[in-house]
């Protein structure tokens, strides 16, 4: 028996080539028609007239024959193109039925599919994100904590190829301790970025802020995730989360530790998280997080210790100590990581400013074969080590004199309290120095210094200095994190200073051009109006974009700050929270909106999911972020899902609407549209339920599919309150329509009315199902009431 193999892509390409040839021939025939069908006679005699008529008749006959041939040729090209499309449609239609039973067996046996992304944890529940498929898939993001109660959920683990999900953020507690942020999901077993730890919740009445979640562990070739920032507290700030360790065997930098939370009235700042350790062979340790500041009589907190490098790589810089602005002492700096074989020791972190300047951290010693000690190292007890340091310093002297930076070695930290920039790392390898904390202002605080750039070969960018606090005016802007060049992670942006208006966080540094994690944006400063978070740094060739910094805490009568935008992914990397993917990468999940305790002030809207890369071969757009919750105002809309790639890729799911304790629930965000050719539309986000006499939020509309794919399902409407007289459940979202081949998405169910025995209103109207494809496909089912 003979077999015939057909490649639809080649058939469609051949049809396009043939169509181009036919078009060129038709154009040539049309250009020649004027001169060949109506010849002028050479003279007035009968012979000339007869010859002209003969050749004109020949030209007309040729044009008639050409028209018939062109019609046949067009029919042939059309049939060939339709055949290629039919083969492609058959393959696309076969993918989902073939994959579904395979995934079902894996889900039944292991709880996770073979191919596919894990589900995000529902907002307001603290649920963990689902793990990605064993083969291909990103882990889902952890759900945010329940309002006024719980910790954020952990991010799901990535598959063999995929990234771990981000840990969920916690919410505040009135009079109690803030919940801990969820841990970031572990990266894939091979490639992929680890998830970022969730931000700890702030306390709102006299207790401790929640600790930031730990960063996830990197895969075999991946960097560890960054620890989440600790939440601010009235007494004590929450500790920053520890940075995740890189992949065990080969390459990857350790994740940076999270920044400690600030203390607002009478206590201590939270300690900075320790930097993660690098991979076994190649990679630098993660930088320690900066200690949290104290705005009253308490002391600033200690900076986190830098992580250990691989055999080749620099030790991580210790985090700067936190400042005290109310008469307490500055916090001590964290210790730098120790070099192993080739690489510099990390700088000790600078002490925080205060009534007494905090003690600088101990610098790490350089590698045994080659490497310079970090700044403020311990006294050497080895003559051989002392000789090695002297030789390297002699080599560095001319480079330092001519260019302002050494050949091998770290840049110096900026002086605390001056806002001085950190020095650049050595031309060959070295970490950038941390930026100095901004000046303490009588009115406005000074900006923090920028972190220094890492070395050309390998080295981590320095962490930006935190902005100085302003007594009655603006808090200082946090310094930008330093950028890495080839191999290395970007430095984290500095936190904004506290003030009447909190300072904005600094932007994270860009990752190395080849490998390394992008730096996270700094957190906004606290104030009557919180400062905005800094933007995450952009990823390198294989690196994901950095997460945007969280918005600053606002007073009970003011608004919290807006979260920073996620950085764009590298060529193959995914975007940070809300950032666009690289050329081939997936879009990042939109950031969750901030929680609001102010009377009549709604929480922040969920961020839009990032679009997948233009040339993505199937990567999805990022899911929209969930809307922020509110105690006294209406919930806000969830973010829209990101679009798939230009041709291939599914749209991201819309974010869930924000929960409201007394107002109407927020509407779910719309699902993102798929790529033009192949991909399914994203599902609409669910509308938030409401409590009391209020109306549930409407579900978001499903996204439109590509030419071959399924329309996205509409989101379910939110339920109305327990005693919601005259209020109805939220309306279900409309299902997305298919285009050529594929089923329309189902409409969302309407929200439930009040519980039995209560004076509840009517259930919400259901959403209409989307239209099926023009060539093949069923209409989606209408939602249920």
Swiss-Prot record:
Keywords on record: Repeat
Gene3D superfamilies referenced in this protein's UniProt entry, alphabetically: HP0062-like domain (1.10.287.850)
Top-level taxon in the UniProt lineage: Bacteria
Domain PE: 1-93
Record Pfam families: PE
Keyword Repeat appears in the UniProt entry: yes
Family to which the UniProt record says this protein belongs: Belongs to the mycobacterial PE family. PGRS subfamily.
Protein name: Uncharacterized PE-PGRS family protein PE_PGRS10
Gene from which the chain derives: PE_PGRS10
